[in-house]
Amino acid sequence: MKSHAEVVIIGAGVIGTSIAWHLAKAGCHDVVILERSHICSGSSSKGVGGFRQQFNTEIDVRLSQITLPILLEMAEEIDLHQNGYMYLALNEQEWQQIQARAKRQQAWNVPVELLSTDEVAYRWDFLNTSDVYGAAYCAKDGLSRPALATAAFAKRAQALGVEIVENAEVIAFERNVSDDRIEAVQTSQGRISANKVVIAAGPQSGAVGSLAGIDLPVKPMRRQAFHTGPSQAAASTAPLTIDETTGFHFRPDGDGQLFAMSNNEPLGEENLTVDLEFGARVLGFAKHRLPQLSIEKIATGRAGFYEMTPDAHPVLGAIPGVEGLYCACGFSGHGFMHSGATGILMAELLTSGTTSTLDISPFAITRFAEGKLLGDGAVL
């Protein structure tokens, strides 16, 4: 590991590697990523892997729209398929809400369409639509693999001179008390000084922030996903489909299906055990929605973390009062689908002091103390 870098990034997940690549593309090649384990060893390796433009706030939509072309350029490399995303309304109130939401999204240039129950049944005849009132569907949304995207970002960054140091856990920060500037990072592999440091450590970002002396309200929350064995090939064409009422959702995954659902997990607990009792509950929803697939059991399960903030939106930008310290974390389950935009925006900020692609001031850390929390983060 070198002793100094212009920019040190903490975390080699999909966000950290994207920032590094975009920095190098912008001409800043003196970048080091510090990773406590190995590239993509954390949340980026566990995600369901959907990407969508169907959000409740315009700024989230814009992050997805900026990211999508970047992902499409790497489509084959990251196993990207535009199967779409579909939200199913299971009662009249939800159907009214989905229609209103789709109208807003269309005004933000999201190519979302509203489908009747009959249209859903015709397009995807393996779905049980007996309780469906209608759906919102965007064909440009779809599926990918965040681990492959992380590897692709990392490879491109390294080709432009970025150094990625694995097994380098951050243990302390050095701050100059005279001007309150971050001067260096102490790691399990030694010390590295830097002009700028970016915390992009996913669910561990809050803990890393504490080492730097800041209150960064990012906490891990367990999310689980369950995989079936081989199922009928027709389901491979399915969009990532969400039951609006329960949050149950599924996507094609290899020769089977991947199911997930919120379980009201506590914040801050680093528990990665798989709850098979919860898996059985999820399986019940899967059997109801996909009766033709004759799904009898779960083959495997996995657990990872969302990196949650109080308003389920990220913290992006400089940290006031600590010169040279920046954050790009707290994506609350949306890191992969906003990774490209985050790389662009943070590269702009780090090289020029401002962003030109999109105003990121709504994501400032100061919003929590000022009571300026953002709207519904549309977390699945």
Where do the language-model regions lie?
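Beta1/beta-strand and adjacent pyrophosphate-binding region of the FAD-binding site
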Residues: 2-15, 32
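Core beta-strand elements of the Rossmann-like FAD/NAD(P) dinucleotide-binding domain
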Residues: 3-5, 186-196
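Active-site substrate-recognition segment that forms the wall
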Residues: 21-25, 48-52, 65, 73-84, ...
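Glycine-rich FAD pyrophosphate-binding loop
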Residues: 24-44
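Dinucleotide-binding Rossmann-like beta1-alpha1 core, especially the glycine-rich loop
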Residues: 48-123, 247-249, 285-287
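Flavin (FAD/FMN) cofactor-binding and adjacent substrate-gating region
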Residues: 72-73, 90-160, 165-166, 172-181, ...
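C-terminal catalytic lobe of FAD-dependent flavoproteins
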Residues: 287-380
